[in-house]
Amino acid sequence: MNARIPPSVLNAAHTLSQVSTLWDDQIVPQLQDYIRIPAKSPMFDADWAANGYLDTVVRNTAAWIEAQKVSGLVLEIVRLPGRTPVLFFEVPATKVGSTQTVLMYGHLDKQPEFTGWRNDLGPWTPKIDDGKLYGRGGADDGYAAYAAIAAIQTLKTQNVPHPRIVGLIESCEESGSYDLLPYIDVLKTRLGEVALVVCLDSGAGNYDQLWLTNSLRGMASGVLKVEILTEGVHSGDASGLVPSSFRIMRQVLDRLEDSATGRLLPASFHCEVPADRLSQAKATAAILGDEIYKRFPWAHYDCGGATAFALPTTTDPLQALLNRTWLPTLSVTGADGFPEMKNAGNVLRPYTAFKLSLRLPPLVEAAAAVQELKALLEDNAPYQARVTFEGLSSATGWNAPDTASWFEDALNAASQAHFGAPCGYVGQGGTIPLMNMLSKGFPAAQMMVCGVLGPKSNAHGPNEFLHIPYAKKLTAAVAHVIAQFP
């Protein structure tokens, strides 16, 4: 005879079954509709308010949540003048004597289309293939609000007592969350005493276990422009006398980066890796091994009958993890001042402009780094060229607080229950601006930063996908952790 499960304990099999049914019947169709809407973040759609796409996805998500009729749930779309909307919901506690709050976070704005999608795929054309839902924003991070409600629903249907739960779903995250702080100020009293944050905007080392993000890099982006002429001139007439704006750009960037290694030169852009993070990185490197770098779509070509692949900066698994999570890195993500190849005549161009994306270690303050970066790039320009750096957005990274024993136990139990493996810990190279804000505002809170962005899911790039089976198990695991909240 099977032992009776106490009513306060979540039944793992029942939870996964219920969550899976909701995903199949409702959440996946909702996400397909969401993918069809080009709800690009304000940085990538200056006319976002007039276009109305962000408002549409927020309204659609709110309508679905209200249709679920979760007991006690109250929802509001909060709007501040000139700012992107925020979806906020509250579910009162059913646990006797509970005074603390669980905050669930996600976002609905998207990165732009980018190029290189498979012929049968597109950013705004949802397609399910081999258990994966392809399309822009499904995994980053449109699913979050739906998964949060699904997790709450399974607590309700199994009559498992839970703390007060609030949801904060923004629509400016991909632009650096510059609209979020004013909303947090407005909602601060309604947030309550936050003791657990569930952020569903992160990644996974594989699809075989629950992964907790233990750090996030910060970021700073901006446009670096080098001007040497007021208009283009004949390259045969001017080259050799008029310096190339591209060559000046290279000289200026050499102040920031060692181009031979990719190492950033300013010491203030680096920080020491804490001992606990180093220990966790070693454990994760042992789990993931070569897949840490093999998962990327490396260029390849025929070399004497064998296939040669482009190489990463390192093939050591531990160093690979640290390079992408604790080292600062420069990426050039866009360029201006260049004609299309088919229209590129023999002209010495008047200017070169690059959009720079700087990833910063978790413990480096982004605002200070931006000021230092601006001075480093602009001062004493070669040939007295006009060199300007215009910052676009920045956000400080995040290092997770010490893990409480109940939280660690709950994470491992949830991972074992739904994946049959212990919880893994991994740093992420991306940025979630809210996490630093919340850690400062609620320093005692535990942070369940997790997500569906596992190998090859390719958020921000072509062929982004949401791994549906993993998303189902992650949703169930979130419910399990909330059920264990003391």
What residue spans do the PLM features occupy?
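N-terminal helical capping/dimerization or prosegment-like subdomains
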Residues: 2-116, 351, 355
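Active-site metal-coordination/substrate-binding segment of hydrolases
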Residues: 97-169, 473
